[in-house]
Amino acid sequence: MALLGAVALTACSGGGSSSENCLVFGEVPAIYADYQAQRDKIEESAQKSEASYKKASSQIDELKEQYRARIEEAGKKLDGQPIEISTGEDFKVVSPVSLSFKEFANSVNSMYDVKGDIETAKDINLDVTESWLRSHDVQYLMLPLMLIGCDEQGTEVTSARIGSFQGFKVVDGKLVLPTGTKAKLETVPYGDNDYDNYVRVKSVRLALDTKKL
């Protein structure tokens, strides 16, 4: 995977409080973790009888509605809050990048539109073999743009797809993403209990996912 930039963000402070402000998702990871913990307690306390399961199911439905409201409130706080991006020499931020709460995909899994504009600041050359070039029509090639969270040692601990790039060219037998190519920013979900990973994140960077190559 080719790493193409860096994002300077504030990591979670630790401790599991639902008011903690974690990375681009703000308070959402901590609230989601609270929901999972409360749901687990209800499920564990249910006795092995039809009546107890019905009671637990009702409690979980009520819990879900309460936490959906909290997650939506926290998600809407992200609207218009720019992410400070250190783009390096590969990217240029044309307009500030931020998240905007969109909807719930299901249950308490929330979706966010990625707003703003990012484009390449120079030609980006990608290593591929001649046989790969002969067997692929690059006009249809699309590569994801990833947001990678790293711990204190620089090890990747979280990743999220925030967009994609198209418009690749073959120049002098090499695969190139030309200067000025705009990223198509997409919708990013938060629906995994990644709180423990976000607590460890100390820095975030952008990366072009080149697994397809």
Predicted regions and their residues:
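Transition segment at domain starts
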Residues: Q59-E119
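C-terminal motif of bacterial Sec signal peptides marking the signal peptidase cleavage site
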Residues: A8-A11
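Intrinsic-disorder/low-complexity, polar/charged segments enriched in Ser/Thr/Lys/Arg/Asp/Glu/Gln
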Residues: M111-K115, D123, K182-K184
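Short amphipathic, basic-aromatic surface patches that mediate peripheral association
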Residues: I118-H136
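Short, solvent-exposed, Trp/other aromatic-anchored flexible loops in extracytoplasmic proteins
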Residues: R134-V138, P144, C150-L213
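Bacterial signal peptide processing site
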Residues: S13-G15
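Sec-dependent N-terminal signal peptides
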Residues: M1-G5
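Amphipathic alpha-helical coiled-coil/heptad-repeat segments
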Residues: V24-Y67, A74, L78
